[in-house]
Amino acid sequence: MDRVYQLSLIVHIFSAIVLVGSMFFNVAILTPALNRIPPAQSAAVADKVGAGLRVAGPASLLLLGLTGFMRLYDLGVLGVFFTVDFLTDSWKLAVPLWLMFISWLLLAITGTLSAIWYEKVLARKLPYSAGLRDLEERRAAQEKISGYQERLNLVNTTLGGLAALGGALFSSGLLN
């Protein structure tokens, strides 16, 4: 059984690297590059590159949740993790673990919002019967949602960085 928990730690760390790395790539490299090219080309590139990110993000979030709770069980704190006593009595252990948990939970929420916005507004195609007015309304809605999406990407990247900080604090033992 010890091998299972060692493997879960490896999967947990790898998933964190994939998630945080893809978020930093999106914010620091992809978005600025897309803003420098014409909108039609930008949309095509974003759709192709984004397809991989839309798989990597949810998959790594799911793996982080699964392996995170397995790690809590392995540490023997899963039963008391959601109690006030754990936060007050074991705060040196609780702070980095809760930082990771809250970041993960918020990333799951914002990731779901991003997916809904993408599917409902950004990726939806207009019908063939659409006129110029429909096209302009669609473009305005896409521009508005794209602005929200860019801000949400910054929030997600910050949350990913905080979760990584929690993991680093926990594994380094700096708070002990």
Give the location of each predicted region.
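Polytopic transmembrane helical bundles with strong interfacial aromatic enrichment
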Residues: 1-176
